[in-house]
Amino acid sequence: MIEVVAELSRGPVFLAGEALECVVTVTNPLPPTATSASSEALAWASAQIHCQFHASESRVALPPPDSSQPDVQPESQTVLLPHRGERGQCILSTPPKILFCDLRLDPGESKSYSYSEVLPVEGPPSFRGQSVKYVYKLTIGCQRVNSPITLLRVPLRVLVLTGLQDVRFPQDEAVAPSSPFLEEDEGGKKDSWLTELAGERLMAATSCRSLHLYNISDGRGKVGTFGIFKSVYRLGEDVVGTLNLGEGTVACLQYSVSLQTEERVQPEYQRRRGAGGAPSVSHITHARHQESCLHTTRTSFSLPIPLSSTPGFCTAIVSLKWRLHFEFVTSREPGLVLLPPVEQPEPATWTGPEQVPVDTFSWDLPIKPEASHTFLSVQPASYCYSVRSHIRAI
């Protein structure tokens, strides 16, 4: 039996354009109760990164596959199929890299190999939605002599930061170490430069604070004013807003605000509803705040953006957008007063009305979450992610 261990030193979360580094260790373990063991021979091992795409048949109408594409890969490529046995289509893959060939391990012996690859910037981010799924994996294929190929898959999470797709890595002199006594390899320079640039762009986009005011009105008058300081946020940050109802001419009885994502299938890929298709637009609520606000002049809310969520993006098949979805319940009666009178001629019991005629309306405000600094500042020594696989003899 051969044991293969893949270890990511800095965790499974990466930025598109960043270099992934993985250490693959191949071991021929020595059984503790075995009296004798033989050496094991491995023909080869290869690794590559691929993005698997899967669409819901009830929501997305994909064109038929191209029959002109051959089912068998040409002899010039490796026989490794990273997406073998998985649902969907492989829409993006890096060139395979050979880790070793003709490896023989004695009992108890192990060998380690380093794999490095830059994550493509032209691909979509990792996403699991109602209509489509984009899943990234690092696949390591290993084959024993005269045995089938065994695959080891390491799940990855890839984030895309707006504006980095067109950035080119500068020349060596532009990213030289600040100290002449420090040495840094080419991959480390590029990785640190990209992380620093992403952090600067993210800070510039999310640190700008300017109060934006929105008048909220229905068909009968003004309900209130909503205030928010910015529209670009980081994953894990709180969306804070204030609502001023004291200036309104229409009484607001209750309001709710939801932090939602809108997943919309592009028109050319939408499945017709008459053919048994599901809606082409789906909404997911990540956080919600509800409050009864009669006689409330000013209130506020705070909604956290989950770290596990995906920032907005757009592909040829689907788009994802974020929004604040407001729902207001207002009174139809002008000048509604539900307080007891201040002066009572004699002791009496006051009760509120059993029924109040109301109207409801909604309002959507787009916002834009971006990748978080939490993912851009993970230190190699603080996180270790490993996956194990066993290759057994026939």
From Swiss-Prot:
GO molecular function: guanyl-nucleotide exchange factor activity; small GTPase binding
Signal peptide residues on this chain, from the entry's feature table: none
This protein's UniProt keywords: Cytoplasm, Guanine-nucleotide releasing factor, Membrane
Single biological process term from Gene Ontology: retrograde transport, endosome to Golgi
A GO-annotated cellular component: cytosol
Family: Belongs to the RGP1 family.
Protein name: RAB6A-GEF complex partner protein 2
